[in-house]
Amino acid sequence: HKPPDLPVHPSQNHYTDTLGNCFCAAYPGLACRPVNRLDRNTSGLCVFAKSAYAANQLQYHLQKRYYAVVEGVLTGSGTVSAPIAREQESIIIRCVRADGKPAVTHYRALQHNDKYTLLQLRLETGRTHQIRVHMAHIGHPLAGDTLYGGRTDAIDRQALHCGRLILPLVQKTGTVTVGAALPE
Protein backbone atom coordinates (compact mmCIF):
# COMPACT_ATOMS: atom_id res chain seq x y z
CA HIS A 1 0.00 0.00 0.00
CA LYS A 2 1.73 3.17 -1.23
CA PRO A 3 1.18 6.27 0.88
CA PRO A 4 0.81 9.65 -0.78
CA ASP A 5 3.98 11.72 -1.36
CA LEU A 6 6.10 8.66 -2.18
CA PRO A 7 7.30 8.28 -5.79
CA VAL A 8 7.20 4.79 -7.31
CA HIS A 9 10.53 5.09 -9.13
CA PRO A 10 13.54 7.44 -8.99
CA SER A 11 13.23 10.78 -10.74
CA GLN A 12 14.58 14.30 -10.42
CA ASN A 13 14.85 15.24 -6.72
CA HIS A 14 13.81 11.68 -5.73
CA TYR A 15 16.78 9.36 -6.18
CA THR A 16 16.59 7.26 -3.03
CA ASP A 17 13.21 7.95 -1.40
CA THR A 18 11.01 5.80 -3.64
CA LEU A 19 8.88 2.68 -3.45
CA GLY A 20 11.28 1.12 -5.96
CA ASN A 21 14.18 1.70 -3.56
CA CYS A 22 12.15 0.00 -0.80
CA PHE A 23 11.53 -2.98 -3.10
CA CYS A 24 15.24 -3.25 -3.97
CA ALA A 25 16.20 -3.13 -0.28
CA ALA A 26 13.69 -5.87 0.56
CA TYR A 27 14.64 -8.05 -2.45
CA PRO A 28 18.31 -7.28 -3.22
CA GLY A 29 18.70 -10.07 -5.77
CA LEU A 30 15.76 -9.00 -7.94
CA ALA A 31 15.35 -6.27 -10.54
CA CYS A 32 12.75 -3.61 -9.72
CA ARG A 33 9.82 -4.09 -12.12
CA PRO A 34 6.83 -1.87 -11.25
CA VAL A 35 3.72 -3.15 -13.02
CA ASN A 36 1.39 -0.25 -12.29
CA ARG A 37 2.79 3.19 -11.59
CA LEU A 38 1.03 5.67 -9.39
CA ASP A 39 1.68 9.40 -9.36
CA ARG A 40 3.71 10.55 -6.35
CA ASN A 41 0.65 11.97 -4.57
CA THR A 42 -1.68 9.07 -5.41
CA SER A 43 -2.15 6.50 -2.65
CA GLY A 44 -3.01 2.84 -2.91
CA LEU A 45 -1.97 -0.47 -4.35
CA CYS A 46 1.16 -0.83 -6.43
CA VAL A 47 2.44 -4.15 -7.81
CA PHE A 48 6.05 -5.13 -8.47
CA ALA A 49 6.94 -8.26 -10.41
CA LYS A 50 9.85 -10.57 -9.62
CA SER A 51 10.56 -11.46 -13.27
CA ALA A 52 10.31 -9.87 -16.70
CA TYR A 53 7.84 -12.57 -17.75
CA ALA A 54 5.55 -11.91 -14.79
CA ALA A 55 5.78 -8.14 -15.33
CA ASN A 56 4.74 -8.56 -18.96
CA GLN A 57 1.82 -10.84 -18.13
CA LEU A 58 0.60 -8.64 -15.30
CA GLN A 59 0.96 -5.37 -17.18
CA TYR A 60 -1.46 -6.39 -19.92
CA HIS A 61 -4.00 -8.23 -17.78
CA LEU A 62 -4.06 -6.28 -14.53
CA GLN A 63 -7.45 -4.74 -13.74
CA LYS A 64 -7.41 -1.60 -11.59
CA ARG A 65 -10.13 0.23 -9.68
CA TYR A 66 -9.49 3.74 -8.52
CA TYR A 67 -11.40 5.99 -6.17
CA ALA A 68 -11.35 9.76 -6.58
CA VAL A 69 -13.05 12.72 -4.99
CA VAL A 70 -13.96 15.24 -7.68
CA GLU A 71 -15.30 18.74 -7.41
CA GLY A 72 -19.00 19.21 -8.05
CA VAL A 73 -21.88 16.78 -8.17
CA LEU A 74 -21.91 13.79 -10.52
CA THR A 75 -24.60 11.11 -10.37
CA GLY A 76 -24.95 7.75 -12.05
CA SER A 77 -22.18 6.50 -14.28
CA GLY A 78 -20.49 7.51 -17.48
CA THR A 79 -17.56 7.13 -19.82
CA VAL A 80 -15.00 9.69 -20.93
CA SER A 81 -13.42 8.81 -24.26
CA ALA A 82 -10.98 11.56 -25.17
CA PRO A 83 -7.43 11.36 -26.57
CA ILE A 84 -4.62 12.51 -24.29
CA ALA A 85 -1.41 14.23 -25.38
CA ARG A 86 1.47 16.01 -23.70
CA GLU A 87 0.91 19.74 -23.34
CA GLN A 88 3.23 21.28 -25.93
CA GLU A 89 5.20 23.48 -23.54
CA SER A 90 5.44 20.99 -20.67
CA ILE A 91 7.06 17.67 -19.89
CA ILE A 92 4.57 17.05 -17.07
CA ILE A 93 1.13 18.39 -17.99
CA ARG A 94 -1.18 16.37 -20.24
CA CYS A 95 -4.27 17.57 -22.08
CA VAL A 96 -7.14 16.33 -24.22
CA ARG A 97 -6.17 16.91 -27.84
CA ALA A 98 -7.29 15.39 -31.14
CA ASP A 99 -3.79 14.17 -32.01
CA GLY A 100 -3.35 12.45 -28.63
CA LYS A 101 -3.37 8.75 -27.84
CA PRO A 102 -6.79 7.12 -27.31
CA ALA A 103 -7.90 7.08 -23.67
CA VAL A 104 -11.09 5.73 -22.08
CA THR A 105 -12.17 6.17 -18.45
CA HIS A 106 -15.35 4.70 -16.95
CA TYR A 107 -16.72 6.20 -13.75
CA ARG A 108 -19.53 5.52 -11.30
CA ALA A 109 -20.69 7.94 -8.62
CA LEU A 110 -20.75 6.33 -5.17
CA GLN A 111 -21.83 9.27 -3.02
CA HIS A 112 -21.82 13.04 -3.04
CA ASN A 113 -22.54 16.17 -1.07
CA ASP A 114 -23.13 19.67 -2.41
CA LYS A 115 -19.39 20.21 -3.17
CA TYR A 116 -17.78 16.85 -3.96
CA THR A 117 -18.48 13.42 -5.44
CA LEU A 118 -16.73 10.15 -4.61
CA LEU A 119 -16.22 8.14 -7.80
CA GLN A 120 -15.10 4.61 -8.58
CA LEU A 121 -13.12 4.59 -11.82
CA ARG A 122 -11.96 1.92 -14.25
CA LEU A 123 -9.46 2.56 -17.03
CA GLU A 124 -9.46 0.87 -20.41
CA THR A 125 -6.15 2.55 -21.20
CA GLY A 126 -3.34 3.70 -18.96
CA ARG A 127 -2.22 7.13 -20.09
CA THR A 128 -0.19 9.41 -17.85
CA HIS A 129 -2.52 11.43 -15.59
CA GLN A 130 -5.52 9.90 -17.41
CA ILE A 131 -8.05 10.15 -14.57
CA ARG A 132 -6.88 13.62 -13.65
CA VAL A 133 -7.06 14.89 -17.24
CA HIS A 134 -10.41 13.26 -18.04
CA MET A 135 -12.15 14.47 -14.91
CA ALA A 136 -10.87 18.03 -15.46
CA HIS A 137 -11.97 17.76 -19.11
CA ILE A 138 -15.59 17.11 -18.09
CA GLY A 139 -15.51 19.98 -15.60
CA HIS A 140 -14.93 17.95 -12.42
CA PRO A 141 -11.23 18.16 -11.48
CA LEU A 142 -9.97 16.06 -8.60
CA ALA A 143 -10.10 17.77 -5.24
CA GLY A 144 -6.61 19.02 -4.41
CA ASP A 145 -5.26 18.60 -7.95
CA THR A 146 -3.84 22.07 -8.61
CA LEU A 147 -2.12 20.90 -11.81
CA TYR A 148 -5.52 20.35 -13.45
CA GLY A 149 -7.66 22.99 -11.79
CA GLY A 150 -8.59 21.41 -8.46
CA ARG A 151 -8.84 23.43 -5.28
CA THR A 152 -6.91 22.65 -2.10
CA ASP A 153 -9.42 23.84 0.49
CA ALA A 154 -10.41 20.23 1.39
CA ILE A 155 -7.20 18.27 0.70
CA ASP A 156 -3.62 19.27 -0.11
CA ARG A 157 -2.99 16.58 -2.76
CA GLN A 158 -5.05 15.08 -5.56
CA ALA A 159 -7.76 12.92 -4.01
CA LEU A 160 -6.92 9.74 -5.94
CA HIS A 161 -6.49 6.22 -4.57
CA CYS A 162 -5.87 2.86 -6.25
CA GLY A 163 -8.19 0.77 -4.12
CA ARG A 164 -8.51 -2.58 -5.87
CA LEU A 165 -6.40 -4.73 -8.18
CA ILE A 166 -7.45 -7.92 -9.92
CA LEU A 167 -4.32 -9.82 -10.87
CA PRO A 168 -4.09 -12.84 -13.14
CA LEU A 169 -2.22 -15.80 -11.70
CA VAL A 170 0.87 -15.94 -13.90
CA GLN A 171 1.52 -19.69 -13.80
CA LYS A 172 -2.03 -20.87 -13.05
CA THR A 173 -5.54 -20.07 -14.15
CA GLY A 174 -7.67 -17.67 -12.20
CA THR A 175 -7.22 -14.31 -10.54
CA VAL A 176 -6.45 -12.79 -7.18
CA THR A 177 -8.20 -9.65 -5.96
CA VAL A 178 -6.51 -7.35 -3.46
CA GLY A 179 -7.87 -4.19 -1.92
CA ALA A 180 -6.75 -1.18 0.08
CA ALA A 181 -9.17 0.89 2.12
CA LEU A 182 -9.58 4.56 1.36
CA PRO A 183 -7.26 6.76 3.42
CA GLU A 184 -8.75 9.11 6.00
Where are these regions (language model features)?
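Conserved hydrophobic positions within beta-strands
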Residues: 70, 106-109, 142
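RNA pseudouridine synthases
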Residues: 2-88, 101, 112, 159, ...
